[in-house]
Structures are given as C-alpha cells and as structure tokens.
Amino acid sequence: MKFTMGRTMKILVAILIVAIIAIVMLSPYSFEKYTASSKMIQVTSTDTVTKDANGKKKQQEYSYKKDDKKYTEIVNDLDQYSYHFTTKTLTNSSQMSDSSKPQMIMLFGNKMLVISDSGEILLDNHVYRMGYSGGKDAKKMMKSINKILKSE
C-alpha cells in the first residue's frame, strides 16, 4: 500500500510547519525566571563609566541584594520587557552580530545577561532578541536601568 499526499495536503502541512515555527520564534519570554531565583543583581553599563582624579576611565559596578529598593526597581523594570528566539538561538550560537555593541551586563547569581544597542541579548550563552522593532526596547530598558543606577 502506497501513501501519497495530495498537493493541497502538502501545502497545508507546509503552512502548519511555518506557523508553528513562527509561533515559537515570536513568543515572548519573561526575565522573571532569572530574577526570581536571584538573591543579588550586579550591573555594569557603558553609561556608568567615570574618570578618576588622574583622568583614567573607571567602570562602575553596582550590586544590589534582594532586600534593596534598587534591586526591586530593576526587577520591576525587567518585568516590563520580554525577549524571543532568533535563528541564532535555534543554531545554538553564542555570538552576537557584528553590529551589536554590548552596552550593559547584568549578573543574576550565576546567570548572565548581556544587552546590546541593537536589541540582541546574550542570555546564558544563547542569543535572543528584545522586542520586534530593532533595538528600541533594549535601549529604552537600558536607559531606565541606568537612571535607577544613577539615582540617589
């Protein structure tokens, strides 16, 4: 007995496969699974580079424990954003594109998040993307977090 698929059935199967891949690729994921288990957040940003008395650049690093107000503010800010898969996620690539320039690094315990100005993020050595329209969401989130870091 030979099973053959008709032309219409082949088209329907192809459309179904494309739809499933699109749903997986575009489904938003929350940062909550990283922030919920973390007892401390460490943040380094290109916006927090200062100069010492000798004019030498110094990178500021901020650390906040779970009971700190700024920790809560940063987590609340992260909860407003999401990320989704890219083709690089599916190929298990840990390389951001050449046009992506890392702007902020966040450590949640032993988990690391690197955010670039292009919207690409590196999360646990896998490349994902924030938002669906270039790097707008990533830039907006970094601006908000930098504001928290610089506030008194």
Language-model features: where?
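Function-determining sites in protein domains
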Residues: 2-152
